[in-house]
Amino acid sequence: MALSKVKLNDTLNKDQLLSSSKYTIQRSTGDNIDTPNYDVQKHLNKLCGMLLITEDANHKFTGLIGMLYAMSRLGREDTIKILKDAGYHVKANGVDITTYRQDINGKEMKFEVLTLSSLTSEIQVNIEIESRKSYKKLLKEMGEVAPEYRHDSPDCGMIILCIAALVITKLAAGDRSGLTAVIRRANNVLKNEIKRYKGLIPKDIANSFYEVFEKHPHLIDVFVHFGIAQSSTRGGSRVEGIFAGLFMNAYGSGQVMLRWGVLAKSVKNIMLGHASVQAEMEQVVEVYEYAQKLGGEAGFYHILNNPKASLLSLTQFPNFSSVVLGNAAGLGIMGEYRGTPRNQDLYDAAKAYAEQLKENGVINYSVLDLTAEELEAIKHQLNPKEDDVEL
C-alpha cells in the first residue's frame, strides 16, 4: 500500500464525526468483577509467589491472579473509576481474606483464601498445596531457603506483571503471533528471576495473559492505567524498574507502530514497520500534531476496529518524537523532503533515528504487505544485504 493512498484528511473527518456524538455506551464487565483493595495486596503477591516456586506450575490462572494483584496496587476505588471512565457498567465485588477448611488425606486443614468470584477457594487451595510440595523439595536442596527464592518475596507479583507488559501491545495483531518475541524478551530481561523461580515459565504465563485480555477486554484498560501509574512512581525494587522499562518501551515506543495511521505489526523489535516509499516530513508534522490532539492512549483501544483512526499517538511518553516519528517518517530514507520543515526539532529527531536504523540494518519488511514496486524501491534506497531483508 503506497502512502499516497492513505489520506490524513480521512482520519480527521472520522475524528470530527466521532467528536460530535452526543451519546455514550455502557459495556458490561459480566455479572461481577473482583476489585481487590490494598489490604489484600500482600496475599495476592504471595499467591503469585506460590505459582513461581512451583516446579512445572499450571499457569492457567496466573494471568488473572496477576491482574488482581495489579488492581490491588491501584486500589479498589481507582480500579472502579478506570472501568467506569472506559464506559463499563461495573458490578464490583469486594475482596476479603477468609478461612477455608479442606480435608487432605483424612485430616482437616485450614487455609487462608480470598473471597473471589473469579477464582474458587478450591483452586486457591490447590495452588498452595502444589507450592508446598516444591517448597519442601527446595528446603532439601538448599537447607535454608533465601528470601529471594521464597514465595513471599515482595517482588513476586511484579515479576509476573513484567510478562503482561510484554504481551499488552501484541494484542493488536488479533492473534498470538507475537508470542515468540514475548518469550525471547522475557528470557533475556528476567534471566535472574528465572534462575530464582522454577515456575517462572514465560511461554505459559504469556499465554495466560493473552487468554485473560482476550476474554476480559476491560482488563486491558485497567492494565494500561496500572502500567502508567506504576512507571511514573519513583523508587521501588529492581523488578519494578524492569517493569517500567518494559512497559514504557512496549507501550511508549511501540511494538505496534504508526504507518501513517495504517497498522504495522512488529515481528522483531521497535526497528521494524516503517519502510515507506513516499514519506514526506510535512505529513509527519501533521500526524504528530494530530496525535498530540488525540492525547496519551488515543487509538490504542481502537486498533483492532479501526486501524486508520488509530494513530497510536503516545505523546505523553519520552520516546515519542525520536522513535515513533522516526518510524512514521518512513525512516526518512524512503523519500526526500522538499522544502523547509515546520518543526526543525521534529525533523532532526526523525532523520537521526532513520539514519541510525539504516546504519544498523535491522529493518524487517515482511510485516508491511508491500507491493512489488515498493519493495523494489526499498531495495534501491537501502541497498540491503539479502540477510537484512525478511520477505
Swiss-Prot record:
Residues 31-252, 244-290, 338-364 are annotated as: Interaction with the phosphoprotein. One of its GO terms (cellular component) is helical viral capsid. Tyrosine phosphorylation modulates viral transcription and replication. Transmembrane segments: none annotated. GO terms for biological process: symbiont-mediated suppression of host cytoplasmic pattern recognition receptor signaling pathway via inhibition of MAVS activity; symbiont-mediated suppression of host cytoplasmic pattern recognition receptor signaling pathway via inhibition of MDA-5 activity; symbiont-mediated suppression of host NF-kappaB cascade; symbiont-mediated suppression of host PKR/eIFalpha signaling; symbiont-mediated suppression of host type I interferon-mediated signaling pathway. It holds the Pfam family Pneumo_ncap. Its main location: virion. One of its GO terms (molecular function) is protein serine/threonine kinase inhibitor activity. Keywords: Capsid protein, Helical capsid protein, Host cytoplasm, Host-virus interaction, Inhibition of host innate immune response by virus, Inhibition of host interferon signaling pathway by virus, Inhibition of host MAVS by virus, Inhibition of host MDA5 by virus, Inhibition of host NF-kappa-B by virus, Inhibition of host PKR by virus, Inhibition of host RLR pathway by virus, Interferon antiviral system evasion, Phosphoprotein, Ribonucleoprotein, RNA-binding, Viral immunoevasion, Viral nucleoprotein, Virion. The modification Phosphotyrosine is found at Y38. It is found in: Virion; Host cytoplasm. Belongs to the paramyxoviruses nucleocapsid family. Encapsidates the viral RNA genome by forming a left-handed helical nucleocapsid that protects the RNA from nucleases. RNA replication depends on the availability of soluble nucleoprotein. The encapsidated genomic RNA is termed the NC and serves as template for transcription and replication. Together with the phosphoprotein, sequesters host NF-kappa-B in inclusion bodies (IBs) thereby inhibiting this host defense pathway. May also act as a modulator of the innate immune response by sequestration of host IFIH1/MDA5 and MAVS into IBs. Homomultimerizes to form the nucleocapsid. Binds to viral genomic RNA. Interacts (via N-terminus) with the phosphoprotein P (via C-terminus); the phosphorylated phosphoprotein P binds to N-RNA complex. When in a monomeric RNA-free form, interacts with the phosphoprotein (via N-terminus). Interacts with protein M2-1; this interaction allows the association of nucleocapsid with the matrix protein. Interacts with host EIF2AK2/PKR; this interaction inhibits EIF2AK2 phosphorylation of EIF2S1 and blocks EIF2AK2-mediated translation shutoff. This is Nucleoprotein. It comes from Human respiratory syncytial virus B (strain 18537). The lineage of its organism: Viruses, Riboviria, Orthornavirae, Negarnaviricota, Haploviricotina.
